[in-house]
Amino acid sequence: MIPHSSAGVQSWGQPLHAVYSGTGRADLSQPLGQPDRQPEQPSMPVPQLQGRPPALIDLTTNDGDVLEREPPAKRLKIDVHAGSVAGDGSPASAGVGESKSTPSATTSKPPSLSWRARPVWSFQALLSEVSGSAEINGESAAGVVQDVKPPPPPSFPGPPWKFAPADTIASDSAGAQDGAPSKEVQTTPYHIETPSVAPVIRGEKVADFSPWMGNHPEDVLNEQTAKQGYYDRTQVSQNESNTARPSLYAQLKHRSGLQILSSVFAAALEKRQGHNMVTAPSTFKPPPRVTLTDNKREAWLRDLANPNVPLRKLSRTIPHGIRGRVLLDQCLTKWVPVGRAVWLAKCVGANEIRAFKRKGTSGALAIGLEAKWVRDWTANVQQFLEGVITSCGVADWKMKMTYAVSLTARLFFEQLLDHDQYLGWFLTSLEAAPFNTLPVWLLMLGIYWSNILRYRKRGRRLAELLLDKLQVAIKSDSATSLRPLTDRLSLHIRKLTLEHTSSMVLPQSWEKYKDLLSSCLDLNDNVHRAVFQNLAERNARVQRPRKCEETTQQPPQQRVIQLFDSIGSSNDITSVSAASLGAIDDKAALVLKLLEWAATPFRYGVSRVYTGARLLRKWKIAGVDVDTSIISFLGESQMRDQLNMDNIYHIVSELVRSQTFSVGKYLQWLMAKGVADFPQNSDHQPLSGDLALLMQLPVSRLPEHVHNLRNTLLHRAGVEVSKESSTIAILKASIAERLPRIFGSVATSAVSRDPLPSDLTWAVKSELGQWIRRGVTEFGRDPRRAFQDLHSAPSAEHFALTPGEFYTVRDILESFGDLSILADVLKQATVCNDGIVLASAADTVNYHFRSFCVIGATTDLFKRLVESYARLKRLGSTSLDLIFSLIDLGLRLPGELNTVALLRQDLSRIESKSSMAAPSPLSDHIPSSFNETDPLFLLKLDQLLSSASGIDESTLDTIFNLLIKQIESSGGHAKLSVNETCRYLSYLRPFHPKRFDIMIVRWICGLLRSTTGGILSQVLPPLIGVGCVTIQAFVFLVRRLLKSENMMSNQRDLRIDLLQLLVPPPAGQSRYFDMVTYRFHLSRKEFLFKHPEEVFDIIRDAIALIDSQSQEGNYRQVDLGHSAMVLLQILLTKNPESAVKHCTEKLIGQHPSAVTVLTRALDSLLGLDTKAGERLFTSNGSFIFITIDTGPAAPDISVAEKVIELTNDFSLPFCRLKLQLLFNAETKGDVRNEIVDVMFKAAVADSRSRRSNWVGLVRLMSHDAVRQIRERAEKNFFAIPLFEESPDGCSSFAADNSSSLETAKLYLAIIEKLAYSIPDVGPQAVVPVLTEKMDLLLQRLITMQANYSGTTELSHGVDAEHMIRSRTQFERALAFWFSALLRMIVLHRTAFSVPSAAVRPSALPEQTRLLISIFCITLARLPDSVLRLFPAADYFPHSMTAGDCRPCPGILLQTHALDVAASLIDTFPDEARHQCARYLREKCPPFARVQNDSRFLYLLGPLGDSPSSNITLPVSIPSPAASGSTPAPTPSGNPTGGFSHPQQPAFVSGVPTGLPDGLNCAASHLCLQYRGRAIGAYPVRPWELLEDAAPIAGTNDTAVSLGYFDARRVRV
């Protein structure tokens, strides 16, 4: 059955009614006969006053009160009433066919067929049920209390014409409540009318209805009728007077009695069905339009606005000229009720559309003209609504806005507009709406919310639109006043995110809006947080890297290395220890990484040794097996060549001293391993790393048996133990000879005056260091020395260290590198009263600040030094040197700022006292007495500087000039050293600081301008050491002079001297420095740490002089290159990342010589083969340079390979810099290709080893080289076969194909890391390859499904197990390749876009094929549901464990595939989408059920939902002949067979056209029947769903003949 012409689609805002809930049938929403509790809605909106519009309504609500003045929803069935047949034309007949709006009547609940299952024998049965229910309702109170007896049988029903069904009564009563019209004057004589409820019998007669005519026998009044009444005396036989049971029982008892009875009943039903069948031809035609005058047209419109005027009367004279925008404006002006306005629009539209077919046009042209007319009509509606919105602020604007929105919404939901065009215009208008009209559009958004979000094409656009509006509102200047609007936008965004999450998958704009979206959600709520995490993961998987970026999540090894490097600045050992233990689960690997960090040549400083020792102690306490890890580290022979093993032995020595390392365990392991027996004379045979540790172990605290075992193992290994003892004895004698006061005098013959050897073992160093510490401690508290003079009080001077002794002890311990012993010596030195020693001790702590901080001695030593300073202050012997040193040291201690402030107060007090003291009259004669030839010159100078009186400026000038002459003459007759002279200058400065600074600057400028070479390098270090000059100020002065005075004759020497000033001495050189020289080294070290950028500038300016012409020969060039290389190595190892950045900015590309020196420095660090120009180490540690080639070195392919092999976590910055130098060199194309080959092999090897160092190396290459590496990886990836077939047949696949999958995964990882090299337009060559691969994957899936389904029933036993195993392997491989190809599609998505596809004619078929393959594989129903696994972070599926209860464990592979398809559909043209949907509708594989999948419709819709594309009913199909029986059901054959019918070309491409977008609409299930079977869907034409289309309603007054559907009349 199809709807009546008065029926329609679901009205706006009203729920659908049951399809079969008409009058005369049981209403499923409530008991039969029970009155409807919901008040009836009036059929048309009646204004309160004529011309007054309705009140403003809420446009976003979805309740029934929105249409409180709208007609109720139409019944979706055929109701042919007797009243309508009579056609009296009364107003009451206009309401026939309108049903009540019951909330519970929905289309989801099928109607009851009780009235069709049993025949209605009489209207008594209907009345019986009505009376029974009414009785129950009337006695409900008593029935609840007294429900002990069974209910009595229903009473005998009365005649049907005395009572009517409850719903008819209710409708009549509701209609009576409407506005009572004025009673019409009868113009014709009264005649008797037959009751509409009376039963009709054959011959159009009515049963038991005899109206009074005056001539009936009972109307004759006589004596008999007066006495006895009138009655019919019918002759009744005897049988009729008795019961019929005996006669019927004989028939029923017979064998065929029931069949006869059934035949009788079936014949009766067949007769009734045939009698009720609609056989009349269709009499429907749209109401005609007539030409009227303006006055009559206005009168007609006023009648249309009056709800009391029936539409049937108005349908006779619809005026011409009311169409389009005029129609809508007239309805708005006259306040025509919305329902009647829609009726007028339908009448006009139906006539306009039928006009196209009456002109003799072809079918295709008529459809095109209809589509054009609908689009024009939609444009008129849009203009009408825009005009009302723009008239904001005028009178009655709210009421007009309410009416306009209601009318347009009703037109939209009545399917009278082009949905795609209208919703597209709505989104465009919403996007362009300013803030003052945006609330109106947001209100209308609530009306079309579900229609917009039904398909992704509109939903994604709406999501981005709302987010953009919210972002603009938040960032606007009037954000406070827009707060209600932003709250409204946030509410819409939150609702969209929670209810339509897939619309928030935004591949192009997620990074832009993700923070804004998170602010709209309540992340404290578990649901909101889970949804946002799911969205973030889904969006991350469909995005490709836009640029070269470092990985956000570092490997654990890189993380712990950063923690180790951070100790130098934070000095927080405890937190770094805990963080390191939590970063790596494998504690042995953690210990190995720490030892590598401490011994690598790519880090700087001895503080790493003490950092490693302290961390290992903490880890040992935490339960880590440190001993085993150290022993296994030493057993790896490949590590010795790349590491400084002396640092490792130093760490073990520190651990042995603190009894943290188990020497016994190590010796047991060594014996278990076996010690090789070396001959005694094999001195040239190097020992292995684990055996060399045996020589390094300190033996002072070892038990005797362990000591003896060590000596035994050393003797077996060929090491002379006695040689170690003799070495210790000789060195002790040498040290004692240099420190006789501490260790006593020794025989001169036993003393070796050679410097201490540099190859001492830590066994010797530790023994000597402990011996020195013990000697210094005993010397400081020896009672014999303290009390040798009983008559004099003991003084600290008797047993305190002198400056010379302190310098010697410090020099010895620093040459050993034993800073822990040096810290104990400094602690003993703090008890003396010598200001020089205390100042030198403070400078020593400052020089080794990082190491002492790790040891934990810095704060204690500083406090002891401050206490010593306080003691000296009380004694009146304040030392400026000590104050300067303490201030410099205290500034590096954050917790000692108060102490530093006090020290600065003392310093300023002393300086102000000297500068403000008045000079005595005797000072006028002082200059004449001062003479450099005077033997008492030093004595007089000391007396003058130590006196309390001041010095005038002339005296200051005289003394300054004398001291300057002493410096220039290298001591003069007074025999002052340069250091002592500079110290006197520092004592002279506090008297007149400003004048002194001016004089010293003038003198230094004179030295810089002079041609005398070498004097600056001798004078400047002492001046820096005493504090008269700073390195930074001197560098600034030199640059200023070089810029202002371009004609300086010695610019080259000045630059070279400045460079050499910053170069520290070699490690093997003696470090016996006095206080002034030591302070200079401290200042140079601080300058290198704090100002690396300026040092690089100095190196760049000095290296540029190598190529210039010089008269000094090659020696000066070699010296310059060596100095620059040493400085570069120090800077690179102190802070690798920033140093590499400075090298790239300041050296590479600036000068060829700079590249050459940088290359040599890197080669020395990386340990590459030495070449011409590289440094060679001699036995004493000095450097010898041969030559330096100033031209750029040609890159060697072997060098690149070796650099790549040397790449690890520590050398990565240096290897990157080295490769960058190789890539930047001007070489031929074949060499570049070879380098690309090397890098590709390195990338594959590192990826297979799960390392990521190759990424940093490849990033340095040019964009073209990176593209070549990625293309090679893509080529190898596509070359891997999808499935490896086993040799036994093609139906089963190899069980072990993990190797090919791992290889593919490796190449895919390389491609993904280099995805930033993919151009924005996308490589076109990869598109057909990806399409073919995905198509091949689908074909394999179809083949395997067919093979498995064909062999399932035949296989059993071992074959069945083999088949199951083969199928499982196939599905796993399918999931892997599917996820891998999806990732490739994501990376190359831009290649499929429309601009790129425009240059290829095959772009559209490729896009369609790709979508089809993705949909078919995604929605395939595999036995193991492998596509429903959770992909891991690398996009490959893995099973989820039962205990994994994370709130967002991941997205399904199926969901990810649909997201990829959505991202493609966003960029594909609509034609590709339509072709994909058409193919899937017609030829979808049987294992993929996409037709009824909501996700499929969401992604591929909308598919031609314009009503203009409706299909006209073919005239050649005749009406099915009524066979007198119910038509046979549709055959259950191929469900898609009907979709390929040539008469249905439009419906197979998507959603039925002309219907609402929802698939639950009842009209979308109507099927055209032909010869007893359904041949296709019938699209209802919304323009012809007209009620009251004709003045007299006929039996078949519908737009299409009801005979096509075997429709039957329902008599009520």
UniProtKB/Swiss-Prot annotation:
Cell compartments where the protein resides: Nucleus
UniProt keyword Methyltransferase present: no
Pfam families: ARM_SRB8 (PF25326), Med12 (PF09497)
Keyword Transcription: yes
Ranges of biased composition (kind: Low complexity): 99-114, 1518-1538
Biased composition (Basic and acidic residues): 66-80
Keywords: Activator, Nucleus, Repressor, Transcription, Transcription regulation
GO molecular function: transcription coregulator activity
Chain residue ranges for the region called Disordered: 18-114, 1514-1547
GO biological process, one term: regulation of transcription by RNA polymerase II
Domain of life: Eukaryota
InterPro entries listed in its UniProt record: Mediator_Med12
GO cellular component terms, semicolon-separated: mediator complex
PANTHER family assigned: MEDIATOR OF RNA POLYMERASE II TRANSCRIPTION SUBUNIT 12
Family, per entry: Belongs to the Mediator complex subunit 12 family.
Self-association state and partner proteins as the record states: Component of the srb8-11 complex, which itself associates with the Mediator complex.
Role: Component of the srb8-11 complex. The srb8-11 complex is a regulatory module of the Mediator complex which is itself involved in regulation of basal and activated RNA polymerase II-dependent transcription. The srb8-11 complex may be involved in the transcriptional repression of a subset of genes regulated by Mediator. It may inhibit the association of the Mediator complex with RNA polymerase II to form the holoenzyme complex.
Name assigned to this protein: Mediator of RNA polymerase II transcription subunit 12
Lineage: Eukaryota, Fungi, Dikarya, Ascomycota, Pezizomycotina
